[in-house]
Amino acid sequence: AHFAGSSDPVRVLDVGCGGGFLSNHLSKEGFEVDGLDASADSLAVAAQHDPTGNVRYTRGDALSLPFADESFDVVCAMDFLEHVEAPARVVAEAGRVLRPRGLFFFHTFNRNPLAWLVVIKGVEWFVKNTPKDMHVLRLFIRPAELRGMCEASGLKVVELHGSAPVVGSLAFWKMLATRVVPRDFRFRFAKSTRIAYTGFAERLPSGDSNV
């Protein structure tokens, strides 16, 4: 609905696209998608599973995106910001490549003892062969910190919700039984942001106030 008045295809950048789950899904839905990741192996997997053959996969650095200013309608950073040392630079780059009124979508983890217990220790226990230091608590981001990063980058947070796994679903029980996270594992909105949160921000036109 946000882009309903435009006849041009909505151009989406998926930052830290990994194996392409989101990029490939969005391409199937008719969006014009670019996926960026630092891992050549992940990009190869993503391209192999792209049913449309239309996603443009690029190996690159999220801290210095290889794209022109104001070239995307949407930028996604889903489960990515908590893996980088300088998330503020990633957010700033998202703001740079977004067109005015473009949207920045995010999902990440809060930084507190409960998030450490659930996201780090819980995942290590539930999911076998979890890579060492897959998540590091000091890299987790408090909601107020992410709001500040957005404001400094010309982005206004429009919505921010807590996020929690869908407990009791078939995918949840499959994970418990196999200790492998299935592809259909899902999160839902939650009242609390203590563990994880998701939302989106809008790129303000030049000269607009962020208050």
Where do the language-model regions lie?
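A conserved beta-strand element that flanks and buttresses the S-adenosyl-L-methionine
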Residues: 76
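A short glycine-rich, Lys/Arg-flanked "PGG" loop and its adjoining helix->strand segment in the class I
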Residues: 88-100
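Hydrophobic adenine-recognition pocket in adenosine-nucleotide-binding enzymes
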Residues: 80
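Acceptor-substrate binding/catalytic loop of class I
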Residues: 108, 128-145
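Conserved class I S-adenosyl-L-methionine
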Residues: 104-128
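Conserved alpha-helix/loop element of class I SAM-dependent methyltransferases that forms part
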Residues: 1-9
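Class I SAM-dependent methyltransferase SAM/SAH-binding core
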Residues: 13, 19-64
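A C-terminal cap/extension of S-adenosyl-L-methionine-dependent methyltransferases
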Residues: 126, 148, 152, 157-211
